[in-house]
């Protein structure tokens, strides 16, 4: 991921520049700047040289292709992109035919920019063997894949051969796409990244497919780079980035043509591998936006024009948008794909309709709830106990609590009253004090008769002997002892020698 981070920053910068749709001529200096910026990042000098060789002659797209073909299968995506971009030599007249100024009308500039594209420079470096002209390219150009028949014999092998009908339009579109792709891809990126940007492959593919003669040859050249399963998806050859542009063009031009089915099937297979590429969203965006107009007019120029308008928008798209468009384009429906915009509008409408339908069920459910409420009310009317149950659950607990506390308090009060009454009628030892206010010290010297301990009524009669008898006298003190000796006492050693013989 480290090599990709600088590439993303450069791509964002280039996309911002492309959003304004500046003339292709300024695009070349930008490419030169990109080369200068990216070369320190590890781009080989050979790539820059190839790029400079590509720059001088925009019309030399046919001459440069010889660099392309013999790249290992890992570099095959680069090769395919270079073949595609260089092949569109016939594109100049097509681009001239298209009146739209958005395409950067000068075909020479567009081709020049496509040659200047770092993807070509990078591709030139990886491809060590010269590549024959796209028109003259034979299936032998693709060492790995079986050569496709130039006459569109096998649509699965060569997805572009199916697109031979829209080739003029695609051709016109391809130079523009190559221009857009040129600033996006930097030579450093291509040299470092085995899988070129999806936009590069798409633009190159569109260039190839757009040339009636070149498309066939390019298909043969591109197939080596693609999966060994050409039959499943003709565009699987372009797994990473080729699929979106060529598929979009056939959709816009010939929504009804059987070739669209092939292209869409290829696209579906290709979209999955290519979704990882950050730049591919632009191509998907183009597919989604352009098909609305081109589908209406099968004329080659109109789809090309729509392409021209869409590329600027697609370049500004972020990889997140790619994901949004990919599922739409991935549908295998050939005739329906030309109207992706209609399909995009379609899904929301069905969603809205279900939303509208949903309220009705909700209303019905509300009616059901009302009916249930009525039933509950009837129950309340018939039996009030049901209504009181919730209150009883809460209030009953409180009632029980207060009732229990009240009972306990009443019990304690009753016991206290009984105690007081019993204490008044019967006095026992605990009532020895004449008055509750008297201090116990006053009665310490009271005579302690057996009766006093058990029965004593101060309020009642007082025994005479207790009242008249004087208190007993204190006992006499013991005799005084002699005072203790003063001073230290003399100690005698108690030893056998000190003892007298008569001591026992």
Curated annotation (Swiss-Prot):
An example GO CC term for this entry is: Golgi apparatus
Where is the signal peptide, in residue numbers? 1-22
Q: Which ranges are annotated Pro residues under compositional bias?
A: 469-487
Subcellular location(s) of the protein: Golgi apparatus membrane
Ranges of the Cytoplasmic topological domain: 419-504
TM annotation in the entry: 398-418
Stretch list, region Disordered: 36-365, 467-504
Q: Ranges of Low complexity compositional bias? A: 150-161
Ranges annotated as biased composition (Basic and acidic residues): 170-192
- Keyword terms of this UniProt record: Glycoprotein, Golgi apparatus, Membrane, Olfaction, Sensory transduction, Signal, Transmembrane, Transmembrane helix
Gene null: resulting phenotype: Various olfactory phenotypes, such as abnormal localization of ADCY3, shortened olfactory cilia, and reduced electrophysiological and behavioral sensitivities to odorants.
In its UniProt record, which GO terms are filed under biological process? non-motile cilium assembly; protein localization to non-motile cilium; sensory perception of smell
The UniProt regions of compositional bias labelled Polar residues, in chain numbering, are 42-57, 103-120, 198-207, 232-283
Q: What is its main location?
A: Golgi
Is the keyword Glycoprotein assigned to this protein? yes
Q: Which residues are glycosylated?
A: 50
Q: Does the keyword Kinase apply?
A: no
The record's disulfide annotation reads none
Tell me the tissue specificity: Specifically expressed in the olfactory epithelium and vomeronasal organ throughout development. Expressed in both immature and mature olfactory sensory neurons in the olfactory epithelium (at protein level).
Extracellular compartment segments: 23-397
Q: How does it sit in the membrane?
A: Single-pass type I membrane protein
The protein's role, per its UniProt record: Required for proper function of the olfactory system. May be involved in establishing the acuity of olfactory sensory signaling.
Name recorded for this polypeptide: Golgi-associated olfactory signaling regulator
Source species: Mus musculus (Mouse)
**What is the name of the gene encoding this protein?**
Gfy
